[in-house]
């Protein structure tokens, strides 16, 4: 995209409840949106403010039913548009209640939310026990047994460094390279939930849910770290376990180079 000197780059941090969305990415047919998406709703709100179409770039494409605590989105607008900080109240007054803008800032014109992200962190929430409260169901995976957290972390320790993650990619994944650099993969307890947190430079389609489903399945059958490592090294999705349901998954945070988060000095 060619950047005009009369434009500024705005970075939004948004949170959304993915329950009633067909994912992040807008889906159009003959110019009309065919399904309700987060990107579609956000661009409609931005277009209403600016009186002309505004295109956005998201840091990642969450699937239907997947949530975000801190999705990062950038867009360009006229340099004379409202101050960056004013986009928070302006957008929140227009957007549906299942999307909230948490922060808005002017950043370097070189920043692209997707291509300049250094890392992305996801969290997957699991609630263990006989039953759960009704209001928890859209935001967690309920399992009746209590997994062995030490065993889960022993297997998850295989997820470190540069890895070919083909075994955990969905059939429709179109990534040219299946290699991803994983910085962290760990299970822990927080507020009575079993949390799986994973941080990597990028992810394959349904990769996190495939990893979670596989690890929980292997723990249930008493498998070992070697069994998980064998699946990883097989590079075959059919060797892995089931895909965990979408509602437990949250896009948690995005990291960018510090220099790209700074606004040009000549603008306000």
Swiss-Prot record:
* Protein's name in the database: tRNA pseudouridine synthase A
The catalytic site is made up of 63
Query: Which UniProt keyword terms apply here?
Result: Isomerase, tRNA processing
Residues annotated as binding substrate are 122
GO biological process: one example:
tRNA pseudouridine synthesis
The record's note on quaternary structure and interaction partners says: Homodimer.
Please give the InterPro entries that the UniProt record associates with this protein.
PsdUridine_synth_cat_dom_sf, PsdUridine_synth_TruA, PsdUridine_synth_TruA_a/b_dom, PsdUridine_synth_TruA_C, TruA/RsuA/RluB/E/F_N
Among PANTHER family, the record links this protein to: PSEUDOURIDYLATE SYNTHASE (PTHR11142), TRNA PSEUDOURIDINE SYNTHASE-LIKE 1 (PTHR11142:SF0)
**What is its biological role?**
Formation of pseudouridine at positions 38, 39 and 40 in the anticodon stem and loop of transfer RNAs.
The EC number of this protein is 5.4.99.12
- Enzyme class, UniProt record, top EC level: isomerase
A Pfam family that this protein carries is: PseudoU_synth_1
SUPFAM superfamilies xref list: Pseudouridine synthase (SSF55120)
Provide the catalytic activity annotation.
uridine(38/39/40) in tRNA = pseudouridine(38/39/40) in tRNA
The entry lists its GO molecular-function terms as: RNA binding; tRNA pseudouridine(38-40) synthase activity
This chain's source organism reads Treponema denticola (strain ATCC 35405 / DSM 14222 / CIP 103919 / JCM 8153 / KCTC 15104)
- Which family does the record claim for this protein? Belongs to the tRNA pseudouridine synthase TruA family.
